[in-house]
Amino acid sequence: MPLLQTFKNEVRIPENNDWVVFILIGCLFLYIFMMNVIEREANLKDFLLQKYYDSSNNLPSWMITSLVTALSLSVLVSQYIPIIPKYIADFQPFGYQLNKIGYTLIIISLFYFIRTALAFLFYQAIGDGKKWSIFYFTSTKFHFILSVLLIILCVTHYYFPIDRNSAFIYYIYFFSFVFIFKVFFYLFHRNNILPQKWYYKFLYICTLQIAPLLMLWKLLFI
């Protein structure tokens, strides 16, 4: 009688990060579409260095860049959200409950939408509406580079053996540096995207940069 070979069924259950792959691949496809179709096969150097008056299709490029930034940022920070507020968790349309990535994406998307709407109204209110299109054209370049860095951080965070608890403090340093750099980038950019008068610049930085970030922090982490 032949010996029966016994196999030990060891099932390894890895952390399921397939959703991260799908989101990041979607972000990359959006950028490929933007560069090849919207920007008419522009290379990276031409896209980043193009001048406003030589550009076209700025609005769709800005929308895609904002979407990718919101998605990649949500993927990165969602794992640090302590809890979903009860009034959000209790809202279950069609029996589905919002998870942390969904909650984070909604909050960050609302953050971008409301801040953009307020920035538009700000430029119109001070009589500087012509600068609005130059503003979001310049902002697109900044957020494009930021989103690429966020995608790299997402890959590192989910697919490399790092201490995620310790990494959180480094993310805070990173985003603090990004914020400070962004303020100076807007202040001293050659396109002069901020209002000329200093008190309007101060008002913009306080009300449309600092205050919204504090509210975003409160909604996500407090």
Please annotate each region the language model reported:
Residues 87-158:
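Alpha-helical transmembrane segments with an aromatic anchor "belt"
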Residues 153-222:
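Terminal transmembrane helical module of multi-pass membrane proteins
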Residues 1-62, 86:
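N-terminal juxtamembrane cytosolic/stromal segments of multi-pass membrane proteins
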Residues 14-31, 95-111, 165-174:
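Alpha-helical transmembrane segments
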Residues 38-52, 121-131, 188-192:
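Cytoplasmic membrane-interface regions of multi-pass membrane proteins
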Residues 28-30, 64-80, 106-110, 114, ...:
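Hydrophobic alpha-helical transmembrane segments of multi-pass integral membrane proteins
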Residues 56, 60, 64, 93, ...:
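Hydrophobic, aromatic-rich alpha-helical transmembrane segments
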Residues 38-43, 73-89, 118:
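Membrane-helix interface motif
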